[in-house]
Regions:
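Metal-dependent amide/peptide-bond hydrolase catalytic core
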Residues: 40, 47-252
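Acidic/histidine-rich catalytic neighborhood of metal-dependent amide-processing enzymes
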Residues: 1-47, 51, 252
């Protein structure tokens, strides 16, 4: 079966609808931009907002209480600590966390000392770290860092997902690697996709094992330079066609 779903960036709403309609499978191959690396696992993730409180005042006064400056100081230290605590080396697929400071806002203009500032942060981490465990670490680091700096910072969770790693003995993983070798004449590279995909929901909420494999470099996705090489698309098509034929027993 082939399924085309929407709203993957909106927490997998299309995949959730697919499951509500009763879709079941022994394996799902998701075509995300993995640079044609066969990804046997999917990162966990957390998305949250940090809000700093200060004290408003006239922009020409020497008063303290600038919430924007407070949050800037806080965030610089906080991110370094998150990078250290969520780094996983003792794995067949090691991964350091990916942290994106995607939004930072505060204040009204130069004549007013801002009393509030907030930022929104997305963290992807090794699948061995659950969303709950990651959240506990972030909560602790927010508390410790704020107390150390004498800052007032509030954490608001926006979204989270658990990752996974497929067993290397999975028969469909073996067949896909075999199909790759037969079509390209090379041994496939395997790894983790270091982003949330529909696989997170399908694996944990639908009980469907997932492999993520597709053309394109994720660095260009969601950017003004988004593109995919035609050569890579054709290679992926040939590999998946052979894989489907192997699974179905077809000779075509």
């Amino acid at each position: 079966s082939f399924a085309f779903v929407v709203d993957e960036e909106m927490y997998g709403r299309g995949a959730a609808e697919l499951m509500r309609r009763g879709m079941r499978a022994e394996i799902c191959v998701i075509t995300e931009p993995t640079s044609n690396v066969i990804c046997v696992g999917n990162a966990s993730c957390m998305e949250f907002r940090l809000t700093a409180s200060g004290k408003s005042g006239h922009g020409a006064s020497r008063a303290d209480g600038n919430a924007v400056k407070s949050l800037m100081r806080f965030y610089e230290i906080f991110e370094r600590r998150v990078m250290t605590e969520l780094d996983v080396r003792n794995s067949d697929f090691p991964m350091s966390p990916i942290i994106n400071l995607g939004r930072f806002e505060g204040g009204y203009g130069g004549w007013v000392i801002p009393s509030k500032a907030f930022c929104e942060v997305l963290v992807h981490m090794h699948p061995s770290i659950s969303y709950r465990d990651g959240l506990d670490i972030v909560r602790r680091l927010v508390k410790e860092t704020a107390e150390e700096l004498g800052a007032v910072v509030e954490l608001t969770m926006l979204h989270g997902c658990d990752g996974f790693i497929l067993p290397q003995t999975n028969q469909y993983l073996h067949k896909l690697k075999q199909a790759y070798s037969m079509e390209t004449g090379q041994q496939p590279k395997t790894g983790l996709i270091e982003s949330e995909t529909d696989g997170n929901a399908l694996y944990h909420k639908g009980g469907i094992p997932c492999i993520v494999y597709g053309p394109g470099d994720i660095a260009y996705a969601h950017s003004s330079q988004e593109h995919v090489s035609i050569k890579d698309v054709i290679e992926c098509y040939r590999v998946l066609r052979r894989f489907i034929n192997m699974v179905s027993g077809s000779r075509n």
